[in-house]
Amino acid sequence: MGEAEKFHYIYSCDLDINVQLKIGSLEGKREQKSYKAVLEDPMLKFSGLYQETCSDLYVTCQVFAEGKPLALPVRTSYKAFSTRWNWNEWLKLPVKYPDLPRNAQVALTIWDVYGPGKAVPVGGTTVSLFGKYGMFRQGMHDLKVWPNVEADGSEPTKTPGRTSSTLSEDQMSRLAKLTKAHRQGHMVKVDWLDRLTFREIEMINESEKRSSNFMYLMVEFRCVKCDDKEYGIVYYEKDGDESSPILTGFEIVKVPDPQMSMENLVESKHHKLARSLRSGPSDHGLKPNAATRDQLNIIVSYPPTKQLTYEEQDLVWKFRYYLTNQEKALTKFLKCVNWDLPQEAKQALELLGKWKPMDVEDSLELLSSHYANPTVRRYAVARLRQADDEDLLMYLLQLVQALKYENFDDIKNGLEPTKKESQGSVSESVSNSGIGSAEIDSSQIITSPLPPVSSPPPASKTKESSDGESLEQDLCTFLISRACKNSTLANYLYWYVIVECEGQDTQQRDPKTHEMYLNVMRRFSQALLKGDKSVRVMRSLLAAQQTFVDRLVHLMKAVQRESGNRKKKNERLQALLGDNEKMNLSDVELIPLPLEPQVKIRGIIPETATLFKSALMPAQLFFKTEDGGKYPVIFKHGDDLRQDQLILQIISLMDKLLRKENLDLKLTPYKVLATSTKHGFMQFIQSVPVAEVLDTEGSIQNFFRKYAPSENGPNGISAEVMDTYVKSCAGYCVITYILGVGDRHLDNLLLTKTGKLFHIDFGYILGRDPKPLPPPMKLNKEMVEGMGGTQSEQYQEFRKQCYTAFLHLRRYSNLILNLFSLMVDANIPDIALEPDKTVKKVQDKFRLDLSDEEAVHYMQSLIDESVHALFAAVVEQIHKFAQYWRK
């Protein structure tokens, strides 16, 4: 290989000198401004643009990489020009070759003087320092100048100096490449011919520049020579060829922090100073300004699950006296208190008595696990005393669960000492039983023998009366005292507590809680024994109910053990019900029905009892009522009804809240009562599954026309029935959406002849669903066609009712969230999966972050999404085929 064919190069990282750049000449004509521009800016007349000779231009040069400057700009020295701009000056840039990144580029801006101390850009151009193969540029380059702008150092640049957008520029670029190849020795050098060729190239370039509308700046990059050999500068990083390990995944680095989980002394000191007794008098008359008042109102409107920041807590504490006239602010104030500091707790409790009394429904929050202070909890109980029995009944299920957060020792200390002469003594009956079963223990508490019915001693009566009226009642004492005054409350309190007493999972997981509920039942039994004649009769009726349910469970077990098909089991069921000697269920003394104690029953009608087609075969039973009527129920054995019981209680509460707002959505909150974790009662409503309606009648409207025809009504249907159907659809769509009810299909949507649509089977709640991609609410094409289609007046009324119901329920969101917060430890299947997320799931459905107008638009989108859900329709057909093959 000849010397001329060798390529000599040096790495950029080894060339430890500054980059140099020569500014040559500027070719082309500057375009003068229009007369309009001169009139608008008279200073233009005195700028270099209007000089007779060439104006005194100068050039600035700056290196950029990735749009960021690498060094300060440098500029050419002053030079006076006459006929052409020619600086012919080398600029030493304040950056060295090893410091240049691969994508470095130099931005050149030409400036003209424009008045005192001011300059304007004549144009700018940008060129990369390294070529596409990593070679540092060398030799002369003509760069296209973009007029009236500064050079752009971003990547990609808006002012590229090397471009080939026109034919003339293509010619210049081709000649520049040939010149470069000649310089690098890729062509045979002939001196006389080279001189002629270079002269011709210069003439062509000059001609092309003059014919174009752009200006061109000629620059020269320095060549590196050593021993008369020209070296190319190749971009290279030091140690760049060394391999380095690359992590394919994330690696957790544990850094020990000796102060982790320790007290922050600064925050603690600030907290103590802010809450000290010295600040009390100064805070007493403190009133917020408008901005602070708005901030306090926002804090007060937070949902109960919202955690206050330290700044918000300090703000509420600072204006605590101002907030005492706002009942909604009390729970937020109590969240700010550090109950471990005695002085702070003392101040809070003193202020508690001066605070404007809070609403009954808001006091439920103070009974949750977040409030352990006994005085605060007793304050909540005192507020509950203002609720009537009907309202108390709506919260009773949650109040029984709230007993888990009470002081267990206080509940136990409330027990009366055992007396030998008291045949109804709970402790004696339990201790003598010798049976470890929780179910038998709890039932024995209420079914133990009664002493003769007579008036109790005056002293006992006085004590009970004083206890009942005491403002210092704990929750257990309050519930028992109210139950002793109302037989309906007593009925449900007994069954709610009895389920907690017999829960085997609770007994094994948390024996202290199990023992607490046994003590509650013992105290309840003692209170009933100490009451007057009517109260003691109440106890005997509860005992009779327990005996009746035990016999019914025994009967269902016998039927389930019976071999054969459903017909044989039906015959066995009716035979056992008719056998009064063995079961004694068809003719009993008058007792309240546990499911609905206002209804008095005399027994079960054997001939009408049937078993449903189901794996567990629940029984449909007709009870003989006191007035000779029939009361149909479903008794399920082998199924936990506590989840259905909770959902139906919430639906019943929502129905009451909506009626309070004069909105009757024709809901059907049928009654459910779990008498154990394995069995319970459900009210039977005469109705037909929507799937069966579609199979037999073809459509929902045909079903209504059959049972409620009307010539004047919409589509030949009674207007009242259609109105009921539309409202019940709207109510259940909104409610099931809020509660996240899943597994919705046309077999668990029932329809009555009066137009009421309602849901059953709440095995999946809070967003759980066995089907993939469920719609937000169950609203399919057949249901909409039952209203007359999406263009009908009834469908528009349905949407309006949905919006109204959603807005009303959002206003009661705190009450609903408080009820769910008391159920997080209730061991209900879908709540037990993620108890810490239960309340958040319900809160998210309310979309409390939206205004009322935004909430209406949100509900509109949910309805539209549900109506047009294609995948839900496919799943419905799959379910229909599955049901067909099962039959």
Swiss-Prot record:
Any one biological process term the GO annotation gives? early endosome to late endosome transport
InterPro entries reported in the protein's UniProt record: ARM-type_fold (IPR016024), C2_domain_sf (IPR035892), Kinase-like_dom_sf (IPR011009), PI3/4_kinase_cat_dom (IPR000403), PI3/4_kinase_cat_sf (IPR036940), PI3/4_kinase_CS (IPR018936), PI3K-type_C2_dom (IPR002420), PI3K_accessory_dom (IPR001263)
User: Keyword Repressor: yes or no?
Assistant: no
Which UniProt keywords are present, listed alphabetically?
A: ATP-binding, Autophagy, Cell cycle, Cell division, Cytoplasmic vesicle, Endosome, Kinase, Lipid metabolism, Manganese, Nucleotide-binding, Phosphoprotein, Transferase, Ubl conjugation
Q: What is its main location?
A: other
Q: Provide the protein's localization.
A: Midbody; Late endosome; Cytoplasmic vesicle, Autophagosome
What PTM annotation applies here? Answer: Ubiquitinated via 'Lys-29'- and 'Lys-48'-linked ubiquitination by UBE3C, promoting its degradation. Deubiquitination by ZRANB1/TRABID promotes its stabilization, leading to autophagosome maturation.
**What are the residue boundaries of the PI3K/PI4K catalytic domain, all occurrences included?**
605-871
Give the sites modified to Phosphothreonine.
Answer: 163
Q: Which CDD domains match?
A: C2_PI3K_class_III (cd08397), PI3Ka_III (cd00870), PI3Kc_III (cd00896)
* Comp. bias intervals (Low complexity): 423-435
User: Region Disordered: start and end of each range?
Assistant: 150-170, 416-435, 446-468
Q: Where is the composition biased (Polar residues)?
A: 156-170
- Annotated region Activation loop: the residues are 759-780
The subunit structure is: Component of the PI3K (PI3KC3/PI3K-III/class III phosphatidylinositol 3-kinase) complex the core of which is composed of the catalytic subunit PIK3C3, the regulatory subunit PIK3R4 and BECN1 associating with additional regulatory/auxiliary subunits to form alternative complex forms. Alternative complex forms containing a fourth regulatory subunit in a mutually exclusive manner are: the PI3K complex I (PI3KC3-C1) containing ATG14, and the PI3K complex II (PI3KC3-C2) containing UVRAG.
Q: What is this protein called?
A: Phosphatidylinositol 3-kinase catalytic subunit type 3
Organism, per UniProt?
Sus scrofa
Q: Corresponding gene? A: PIK3C3
